[in-house]
């Protein structure tokens, strides 16, 4: 017996059409009607659940002379009519670990509520209401601007809307085609020894001089060699106090013992920073292909992310965040995206002035994958965008849309 035949039997007993039935077995949604019960692992005596999805009825059309409903209410009704049932989404999240992890990354609030059906429904509907309200506000703003398009102030606002749309589209394209650019890049550290004291040095070709913290200079027993005549104030993004300069000390890099000078400066969270003076003096090469600092044909591998002490990365853990498009939070210093409320493949509300409708798009992904997503209540365009963002992975695309 196939799942399709089982739905027909349920229809004969309950008068519920197969299109409204969601068969659930072991918290997993049976989406392929062509599979047999044996193929999905259902045996005699097993209990199945049937979840019935009911669509919200459309609001009656008002007469031309009567008052119209608020735009936010209309948007909410449209979303309720086209969006999937919250319980269906919840069961799909619980039944697939990959989808659950994708939702946890993109919508933590919704993922945390997945274990409670009522709480999940409340969170889901609240998010839908917020999105409908924002969309209504955008539509009202566009209508106001289009009412007087020749007003110079309106022209500036329309130009800003177009610019913001271009920025959002650029962000979505980058996240779809170059997602690696939004990851956090590990800084370049190498293990060194200064006067017999082992430490990790930060390689920075953008620094003019090699810098050491006072605590590190004390640990290396070279604080007594600091020439205070070279003290002063360093000015850049902020200010830092320069205590002085150690003109020459021995540093071990790999198996080489090299002379090096250090500028002792306060206010740095890094013990030792190898600057351009040291790198040029010894003709060092930062070889990113090999992942090593090459000096005199000897390659010293950079430390991996797991090998870098946590206190050296604390400055980036608490970095300020900048609000991006669609709720993205971007690190102000590293540029890493730490939270994305809505995936790049999800539906986004357009704020541009209305234009002619685009022709129907063809997709390079299987029609079966598109059909499975549209069965959950999403449109074909949303399904294609989500599949593009997930590189064809069905579960990942559903995770983007939820």
From Swiss-Prot:
Enzyme Commission code(s) on record: 3.4.23.-
- Tell me the Gene3D superfamilies matching this sequence: Acid Proteases, DNA helicase RuvA subunit, C-terminal domain, Phosphatidylinositol 3-kinase Catalytic Subunit, Chain A, domain 1
Can you give the residue ranges of the Ubiquitin-like domain?
A: 1-57
- Give the residues annotated as active site: 204
Any one GO CC term of this protein is:
cytoplasm
One example of a Gene Ontology biological process annotation: proteolysis
Spell out the CDD domains in the cross-references.
Answer: RP_DDI, Ubl_Ddi1_like
Looking up SUPFAM superfamilies in the UniProt record yields:
Acid proteases (SSF50630), UBA-like (SSF46934), Ubiquitin-like (SSF54236)
Regions of biased composition (Low complexity) lie at: 347-363
Disordered: annotated span: 338-369
Kindly report the protein's main subcellular placement as a broad class.
cytoplasm
Where is this protein localized, as stated in its record?
Cytoplasm
Q: Name one GO molecular function term.
A: aspartic-type endopeptidase activity
The entry's keywords: Aspartyl protease, Cytoplasm, Hydrolase, Protease, Protein transport, Transport
InterPro entries membership = DDI1_N (IPR033882), Peptidase_aspartic_DDI1-type (IPR019103), Peptidase_aspartic_dom_sf (IPR021109), UBA (IPR015940), UBA-like_sf (IPR009060), Ubiquitin-like_dom (IPR000626), Ubiquitin-like_domsf (IPR029071)
What does the record give as the function of this protein? Answer: Probable aspartic protease. May be involved in the regulation of exocytosis. Acts as a linker between the 19S proteasome and polyubiquitinated proteins via UBA domain interactions with ubiquitin for their subsequent degradation. Required for S-phase checkpoint control.
Q: Indicate the quaternary assembly.
A: Binds ubiquitin and polyubiquitinated proteins.
Q: Which family does it belong to?
A: Belongs to the DDI1 family.
UniProt protein name: DNA damage-inducible protein 1
């Amino acid at each position: 017996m196939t799942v399709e035949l089982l739905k027909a039997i349920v229809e004969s007993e309950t008068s519920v059409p197969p299109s409204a039935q969601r068969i659930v077995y072991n918290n997993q949604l049976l989406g392929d009607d062509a599979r047999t019960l044996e193929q999905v692992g259902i045996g005699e005596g097993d209990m199945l659940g049937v979840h019935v999805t009911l669509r919200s009825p459309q609001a009656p059309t008002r007469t031309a002379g009567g008052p119209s409903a608020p735009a936010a209410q209309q948007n909410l009704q449209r979303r309720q009519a086209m969006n999937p049932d919250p319980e269906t989404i919840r069961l799909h999240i619980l039944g697939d670990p990959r989808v659950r992890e994708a939702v946890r990354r993109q919508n933590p609030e919704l993922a945390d509520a997945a274990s409670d059906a009522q709480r999940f429904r409340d969170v889901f509907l609240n998010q839908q209401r917020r999105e409908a309200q924002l969309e209504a506000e955008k539509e009202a703003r566009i209508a106001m601007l289009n009412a007087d398009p020749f007003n110079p102030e309106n022209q500036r606002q329309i130009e800003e809307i177009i610019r913001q749309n271009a920025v959002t589209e650029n962000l979505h394209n980058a996240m779809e085609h170059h997602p690696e650019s939004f990851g956090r890049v590990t800084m370049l550290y190498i293990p060194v020894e200064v006067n017999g004291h082992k430490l990790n040095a930060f390689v920075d070709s953008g620094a003019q001089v090699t810098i050491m913290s006072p605590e590190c200079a004390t640990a290396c027993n070279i604080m007594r060699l600091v020439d205070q005549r070279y003290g002063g104030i360093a000015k850049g993004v902020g200010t830092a106090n320069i205590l002085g300069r150690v003109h020459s000390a021995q540093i071990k890099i790999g198996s080489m013992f090299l002379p090096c000078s250090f500028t002792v400066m306060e206010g740095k969270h890094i013990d030792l920073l190898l600057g351009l003076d040291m790198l040029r003096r010894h003709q060092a090469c930062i070889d990113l292909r090999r992942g090593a600092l090459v000096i005199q044909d000897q390659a010293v591998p950079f430390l991996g992310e797991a090998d870098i002490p946590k206190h050296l990365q604390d400055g980036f853990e608490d970095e300020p965040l900048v609000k991006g498009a669609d709720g993205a939070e971007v690190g102000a210093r590293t540029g890493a995206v730490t939270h994305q409320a809505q995936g790049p493949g999800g539906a986004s509300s357009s704020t541009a002035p209305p234009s002619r409708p685009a022709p129907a798009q063809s997709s390079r992904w299987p029609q079966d994958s598109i059909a499975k997503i549209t069965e959950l209540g999403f449109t074909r365009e949303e399904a294609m965008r989500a599949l593009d963002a997930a590189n064809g992975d069905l579960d990942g695309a559903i995770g983007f849309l939820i």
